[in-house]
A protein has these predicted regions:
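Short amphipathic alpha-helical signal-transduction/dimerization elements
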Residues: 29, 33, 118, 122-129, ...
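Extended hydrophobic
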Residues: 52-127
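Acidic, glycine-rich loop-and-strand cores that form catalytic or ligand-binding grooves
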Residues: 44, 51
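Short linear functional motifs in flexible/disordered or boundary regions
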Residues: 40, 111-113, 133
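Amphipathic alpha-helical effector-binding/dimerization core
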Residues: 1-43
Length: 133
């Protein structure tokens, strides 16, 4: 049984999350076309202004991580107390979704997320895709 503090992060279905700083947003960004990425980059550059280079660096790192390891991370970037991993799932109808695992950083340190959990998440996404959903 998890301690009560382990269940503090509650998210409702349909909650909107920032693309640039969450593992869910980053996973989605890594799965879309280059053309779509450019459209999103332009929109976020206008939205974030002087903060855009930092946000873009996070997206670029996520893309690198995804290409090398099959997952994206957000280590305290969306919320300084939350670490998360994300992977895209491609459905047969062309829909792209993100599968994520997030937890308080004191329960799941970055090393555990990067070294174990994120890899398992990527394998789970592959299993789901192989079901032909």
């Amino acid at each position: 049984r998890l301690p009560p503090e382990a269940s503090l992060l509650r998210m409702d279905i349909g909650l909107k999350l920032p693309m640039a700083t969450t593992s869910a947003g980053r996973a989605y960004y890594c799965a879309i076309s280059d053309k779509a990425c450019l459209v999103i980059d332009d929109a976020m550059a206008a939205k974030f202004g002087d903060d855009w280079p930092e946000k873009k660096a996070g997206l670029d790192q996520a893309m690198k991580d995804y290409k090398e390891h099959g997952f994206c991370l957000s280590i305290g970037e969306w919320d300084r107390n939350i670490n998360s991993a994300g992977v895209p799932i491609h459905l047969q109808d062309g829909t792209i979704m993100a599968l994520t695992c997030a937890a308080p950083s004191y329960l799941v340190p970055a090393e555990k997320l990067r070294g174990s959990i994120a890899h398992q998440l990527a394998m789970l996404a592959g299993d789901i895709e192989s079901l032909g959903v």
